[in-house]
A protein has these predicted regions:
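Amphipathic, Lys/Arg-enriched alpha-helical "gate/interface" segment within cytosolic domains
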Residues: 1-22, 26-68, 72-146
């Protein structure tokens, strides 16, 4: 794996922190590999090593890029619930995830905690200004809630 991908304590899941905007609370994190909560409790490692540090810096809007997320094996929703509760008015969005991952998110009842689906699939996200991308996602969520 290229050195730009950070080891986050998971055997098969790696991440890149692409963008953080502290004053507005945005973070963009790109994922690579296989997210496996069933065997390795990847969410616990990811939450404790990455997300908690960002929350401590008042980040409450997380855009997770899933273009390179190959698979997801869910287990319990405890850490997703905890993450969601800790960000109050923020959000967690998984963008550009594969159909089988969307189905697994649904099977694990994660729709209560995270946003995902076709409305968050943006092919040309890499060419967009990161702050504008986050603001665009925020607008979609705001309109969905109303």
């Amino acid at each position: 794996i290229h050195p730009d991908w950070d080891y986050i304590g998971c055997e098969t899941l790696f991440a890149k922190l692409l963008f953080v905007e502290y004053s507005q609370g945005y973070a963009i994190i790109e994922l690579l590999g296989e997210w496996n909560d069933a065997l390795n409790n990847d969410i616990m490692e990811f939450k404790r090593r990455i997300i908690d540090a960002l929350i401590a810096q008042r980040i409450d809007k997380f855009l997770m890029i899933g273009d390179n997320l190959l698979n997801f094996h869910g287990y319990e929703d405890y850490y997703y619930q905890e993450w969601n509760e800790e960000i109050n008015d923020g959000w967690i969005v998984f963008m550009n995830v594969r159909d089988q991952i969307v189905q697994e998110f649904k099977n694990c009842h994660l729709t209560k905690y995270i946003w995902f689906g076709s409305s968050f699939n943006l092919t040309f996200w890499r060419t967009q200004d990161p702050l504008a991308l986050c603001q665009r996602v925020n607008e979609k969520i705001t309109l969905s809630i109303k």
